[in-house]
Amino acid sequence: LTTINKFFENSLNVSETSRQLYIHRNTLVYRLDKLQKSTGLDLRVFEDAITFKIALMVAKYMKYMESLDY
């Protein structure tokens, strides 16, 4: 998730994200491709990135609600 969060922080900019993560640009592209194969969402496409971001927010909210249930 660190890679994904950093990618979102950098407005889906592959070059800047890879620089900040101290990884080669192709490594980041490989990670994004791997995520695309497992989810069907390409985070380099804005609509897919928004869908994924919303899914992360929902998952975080559900985890929070579970913690309130004891």
Q: How would you name each of these model-derived features?
A:
Residues 1-70:
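Cytosolic nucleotide-utilizing catalytic cores of signal-transduction proteins
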